[in-house]
C-alpha cells in the first residue's frame, strides 16, 4: 500500500516522506485526492529532472522512465473530467523551482534537461496530445467561465508540448490557432 498523506488538508504543510518513484507514479495515476496527484507528479518530475541534470553535467543522455510517461498519459486521458486540473498536473516544475532545489545552479543544464523531458513526453504521447488538443476547443464565441478557461489552458499546454517536436504540421496548428484566436490566451 502507498499512503496518500494529508488528504483534504488545506493549511500549508511541509512534510518530508521518502516515496519511491514507483510510489509517486502510483499516486500520480490513482490517488483520489487531486492535490496529492498533482504533488506526486511534481515530485516525480523533479526527481527525474534533477537526475537528468547530473547526467547532463557528466555528458550522459538523460533517461526518463516509461512509467512516468504512462502516468502522464493516464492524467491526459482523464483530462475531459477536469481540464483545469489536468493542465496543472501535466505541467513540469518551472526552471526557477528546479534551481531552488539545487546547491549549485546550472541554468544551461536546467533548461536543456527540462526541454528534453518535454520533448520526450511529446514524442511518447504525440497522438494523445493531438487528440486532447483537438477535443478541447473552447466553445465559440469566447466564454470567460471556469470550464472554458480550463479547456483553453489544456489545449495550449498540449500545443506547447507538441511544439517541442518541431514538425511542420504542428507549427501549422500553432499558426492557425493564432490566426483564429478570439482571446488573448489563445493568441499567446
Regions found by a protein language model. Name each.
Residues 1-188:
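Long, ordered, helix-rich scaffold segments
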